[in-house]
Amino acid sequence: MKWFDKTVSQRQEDVLRLLKKYPDKIPIYITGQNITLNKFLLPYDITQAQLMYTLREKIALSPTESIFLFFGKRREMMPSNMMIREIYDKLKEEDDMLYAVYSKENTFG
């Protein structure tokens, strides 16, 4: 069953099960163009910049492309030096998952 086909309570149960098994991880669901794997468990002590670096590698961006991450329902941009744990605590959804959308832009040429 796809993630968004589940009810909020089913998604929350799944997330709570993951958090119990991996208490030092942050569950995040990332959407955007050219991404095949959407759900990630991230270390709580990485910054948004480190996540963006990992994401760049996963989607194989060219050196001329920039990536932008938007978090939560309101699609907020956060400082790149902000810890993922802080973003999670501030913007996690009712199912305890942090949602993000990335956008890429040809900015360097």
Regions found by a protein language model. Name each.
Residues 1-109:
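Ubiquitin system architectures
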